């Protein structure tokens, strides 16, 4: 179970708020099921993000360029609020999504301690694949305390509505936009032609070009 239009802006934010609303004001099975779905979504976020940097593939209608900021999607802003309950030094500055973040301040739902632990500080190295159902693409992640590699996904044809993105390398820095982080594009300029699922344990590859941020340099190049 999960969202058909997974990781999608702006749909994720409004659906997430609806689930919080059901958890807060419904009862019985509806409250229980909404809580389980919220738990699952937050656990997936914990695995696919690094210090609130989050740039996964998503499903949504074509026609708009994907956002270039990597630290303020509508899921991130809520986790920043909940994370600040565990770490008082955590900055909750956000470039957008304040109206969604407000929900996290007044509802009784809170992610589990273990989920927040993985959001704030990865306890051990890991490599995971998270599926999103038929005619979709997986999220593939490799990371530990010092980095996270996030696969960009693969479009499955126009009817799939999958928006493939670059493979991202997140580091312990203050990068807030895609251009500030190392990333790898798929071949060509059209994301519909991309298969950016080439993330393995501690390693990633693609057929496209590599973007090196202005203030960084590659250790080796060819």
Describe the role of every protein-language-model region.
Residues 45, 85-222:
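Ser/Thr/Asn(+Pro)-rich, low-complexity disordered segments
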Residues 1-129, 135:
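Extracellular polysaccharide-recognition and catalytic grooves
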């Amino acid at each position: 179970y999960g969202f058909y239009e997974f990781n999608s802006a702006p749909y994720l934010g409004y659906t997430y708020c609806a689930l919080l609303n059901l958890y807060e004001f419904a009862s019985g099975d509806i409250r229980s099921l909404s809580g389980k779905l919220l738990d699952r979504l937050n656990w997936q976020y914990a695995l696919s993000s690094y210090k609130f940097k989050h740039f996964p593939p998503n499903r949504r209608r074509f026609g708009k360029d994907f956002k270039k900021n990597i630290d303020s999607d509508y899921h991130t802003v809520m986790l920043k609020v909940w994370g600040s309950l565990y770490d008082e030094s955590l900055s909750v500055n956000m470039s957008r999504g304040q109206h969604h973040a407000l929900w996290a301040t007044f509802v009784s739902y809170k992610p589990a301690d273990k989920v927040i632990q993985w959001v704030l500080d990865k306890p051990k190295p890991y490599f995971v694949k998270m599926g999103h159902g038929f005619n979709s693409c997986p999220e593939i992640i490799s990371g530990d305390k010092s980095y996270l590699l996030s696969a960009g996904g693969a479009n499955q044809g126009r009817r799939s509505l999958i928006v493939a993105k670059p493979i991202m390398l997140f580091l312990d820095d203050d990068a807030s936009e895609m251009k500030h982080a190392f990333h790898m594009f798929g071949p060509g300029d059209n994301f519909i032609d991309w298969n950016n699922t080439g993330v393995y344990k501690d390693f990633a590859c693609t057929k496209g070009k590599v973007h090196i941020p202005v203030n960084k340099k590659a250790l080796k190049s060819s």
